[in-house]
């Protein structure tokens, strides 16, 4: 199978390395200098340093070349750009006049200005594209790059997309499950990043494991309420892309969103934290969208609201936690 991976950040690079072990894989990025470095060293020293990439993996900075590769009869196109760049990439794909027949995206979050999920952006920008879906689940790029075990879910209303994604990714240490709840999978992948900031704050303040467990459990309830209101199914949020991804992102030391929370609790400013990370922390980008959607649906999401207060309203982390503890008692 031919596979084109659009986006050479940490996640796109790790997935391309996995795919290249079994398929004819091409990794694209618009940054020619990044591509030149990949071609010379077979390592993404900018985003995934120390991980050797397969010799068979190919690289190109020409989007037309990548799209032609991913549009072959027996091919799959993987969109690994962040949500913030998804619409622009779709524009470029449409302008290139070569939209692959089968597309799966791996980005997580809501579009900041519109509060749309990735599938809604793709439907608006690539209206004729019918075989598409989302691949998501509890996964750190570095561990995938190291070929450590991982389980992900592909969700699509197209059986052809599910089957092609399964055929592409299900090998080696990667196990793929299938489903059709695109909205539920996307909401889980977006909201868990916001909740991971909350657990990072709690852990950074030294509030203990009991508090962490409470935040994860009550955060899952918030995720599920919003997801169901937006059209997802409740059972999706207890699976890999909901609870599984939340546990990993909220507790794993490789989590950028958890790191943001830890650093906020230590008294660092958000600008300083993001500057030092050098990578995207999607929980920061989509926190306001999550809260806006919750309010539009008349849904209470007190943990997400507390995170927004710390990120954008100048509320001290300890005061935000105190506010959560002062909430009225109620039935679970």
UniProtKB/Swiss-Prot annotation:
The active site is at 192 (proton acceptor). GO terms for molecular function: glycerol-3-phosphate dehydrogenase [NAD(P)+] activity; NAD binding. It catalyses: sn-glycerol 3-phosphate + NAD(+) = dihydroxyacetone phosphate + NADH + H(+); sn-glycerol 3-phosphate + NADP(+) = dihydroxyacetone phosphate + NADPH + H(+). Its main location: cytoplasm. The gene is gpsA. Sn-glycerol 3-phosphate binds at residues 108, 137, 139, 192, 245, 255-257. PANTHER family: GLYCEROL-3-PHOSPHATE DEHYDROGENASE, GLYCEROL-3-PHOSPHATE DEHYDROGENASE [NAD(+)] 2, CHLOROPLASTIC. Catalyzes the reduction of the glycolytic intermediate dihydroxyacetone phosphate (DHAP) to sn-glycerol 3-phosphate (G3P), the key precursor for phospholipid synthesis. Keywords: Cytoplasm, Lipid biosynthesis, Lipid metabolism, NAD, NADP, Nucleotide-binding, Oxidoreductase, Phospholipid biosynthesis, Phospholipid metabolism. This is Glycerol-3-phosphate dehydrogenase [NAD(P)+]. GO terms for biological process: carbohydrate metabolic process; glycerol-3-phosphate biosynthetic process; glycerol-3-phosphate catabolic process; glycerophospholipid metabolic process; phospholipid biosynthetic process. Pathway: Membrane lipid metabolism; glycerophospholipid metabolism. GO terms for cellular component: cytosol. It holds the Pfam family NAD_Gly3P_dh_C. It is an enzyme of class 1 (oxidoreductase). Its EC number is 1.1.1.94. Belongs to the NAD-dependent glycerol-3-phosphate dehydrogenase family. InterPro entries: 6-PGluconate_DH-like_C_sf, 6PGD_dom2, G3P_DH_NAD-dep, G3P_DH_NAD-dep_C, G3P_DH_NAD-dep_N, NAD(P)-bd_dom_sf. NADPH binds at residues 11, 30, 108, 141, 256, 280, 282. It is found in: Cytoplasm.
